[in-house]
Swiss-Prot record:
Entry protein name: Ribonuclease H
Cofactor dependency: Mg(2+)
Species whose genome carries this gene: Cyanothece sp. (strain PCC 7425 / ATCC 29141)
Source superkingdom: Bacteria
Residues engaged in binding Mg(2+) 2: D11, D137
Cofactor binding, note field: Binds 1 Mg(2+) ion per subunit. May bind a second metal ion at a regulatory site, or after substrate binding.
Family: Belongs to the RNase H family.
Physiological role: Endonuclease that specifically degrades the RNA of RNA-DNA hybrids.
CDD domains: RNase_HI_prokaryote_like
Gene Ontology molecular function: magnesium ion binding; nucleic acid binding; RNA-DNA hybrid ribonuclease activity
GO terms under biological process: DNA replication, removal of RNA primer
Catalytic activity: Endonucleolytic cleavage to 5'-phosphomonoester
Residue ranges occupied by any RNase H type-1 domain in the UniProt entry: 2-145
């Protein structure tokens, strides 16, 4: 029997903005097992990497068939974007309140498709000693620096 996902942490990093970037995800299961993921992009921004981490986390949940989930991000941009700003952007044809095109619309559209009412988006302050957030940050920074970190995958689907 598969254990339920208890919580997920996501983070993104970028060396220069834009510049080489990385993202990290740590999935914690109720049975104590962990699944870590990450990736890199050659020329990107911190916000895009934060969004890519959230997308990877939600795709993992969807593949695992494990809603609901608590998703922690240290990006206010991602948290507010998905929980507050997105409905207005869609109503205005993907324009901001100032009438400008929404940045990262391609990724917002993917996040919008993956997001469900069963996702509980939570903000966690970055670099505050939270173990899940710190581990995601280390994964994201390693990928941004061109290194392949050792990823714990005690639970594979």
């Amino acid at each position: 029997m598969n254990a339920e996902i208890s919580k997920i942490y996501t983070d993104g990093a970028c060396s220069g903005n834009p510049g080489p970037g990385g993202w990290g995800v740590v999935v914690y299961f109720g049975d104590g097992s962990v699944h870590e993921m990450g990736g890199a992009a050659a020329a990107t921004t911190n916000n895009r990497m934060e969004m890519q981490a959230a997308i990877a986390a939600l795709e993992f949940c969807q593949a695992a068939g494990h809603p609901p989930v608590i998703l922690y991000t240290d990006s206010e941009y991602v948290k507010k974007g998905i929980t507050e700003w997105l409905p207005g952007w869609k109503r205005k044809g993907w324009k901001t309140a100032q009438g400008k095109p929404v940045l990262n619309q391609d990724l917002w559209q993917v996040l919008d498709q993956l997001n469900t009412k069963s996702v509980n988006w939570q903000y966690v302050r970055g670099h505050s000693g939270n173990a899940g957030n710190e581990r995601c940050d280390a994964i994201a920074r390693a990928f941004a620096a061109g290194r392949q970190p050792e990823l714990r995958q005690s639970r594979d689907l």
